[in-house]
């Protein structure tokens, strides 16, 4: 009955554990992504997947300095792939610096990014 018990112990609910492992070290796949429409005014409403990101400040010192490309986004977290590791970073405790395709750097608080990407479009923001 429990033939595959070893495999079951190592599994997580939802996604498989190794779902991001094949991306490690292959960050070149995001370099060709055309993200020319992202600027400081519309980054809150824009898709973040594929953008280069760096954690500038955080309440947790372990998150400061994480750098890589955003490969997934959930309501409260960004999944960032670096050169040799994948990090899951909470949005609400960090300040991020995104780099656009032309090299401009946009610094934004993670509290403004909390929420699913499709729901952020519906929010109204003060300018």
From Swiss-Prot:
SUPFAM superfamilies the record matches: Rof/RNase P subunit-like
Keyword Glycoprotein appears in the UniProt entry: no
SMART domains linked to this entry: POP4
Name of the protein in its database record: Ribonuclease P protein component 1
Keywords, alphabetical: Cytoplasm, Endonuclease, Hydrolase, Nuclease, tRNA processing
Entry-linked HAMAP family: RNase_P_1
Gene name linked to the record: rnp1
InterPro entries: RNase_P/MRP_Rpp29-subunit, RNase_P/MRP_Rpp29_sf, RNP1, Rof/RNase_P-like, Rpp29/RNP1
Entry domain remark: Interaction with Rnp4 is mediated by the N-terminus; short deletion mutants are still able to reconstitute RNase P activity.
Any one GO BP annotation for this protein: rRNA processing
Oligomer status and interactors: Consists of a catalytic RNA component and at least 4 protein subunits. Forms a subcomplex with Rnp4 which stimulates the catalytic RNA.
Enzyme Commission no: 3.1.26.5
Coiled coil (residue ranges): none
Cited Pfam families: RNase_P-MRP_p29 (PF01868)
Catalyses which reaction(s): Endonucleolytic cleavage of RNA, removing 5'-extranucleotides from tRNA precursor
Localization: Cytoplasm
GO cellular component, one term: cytoplasm
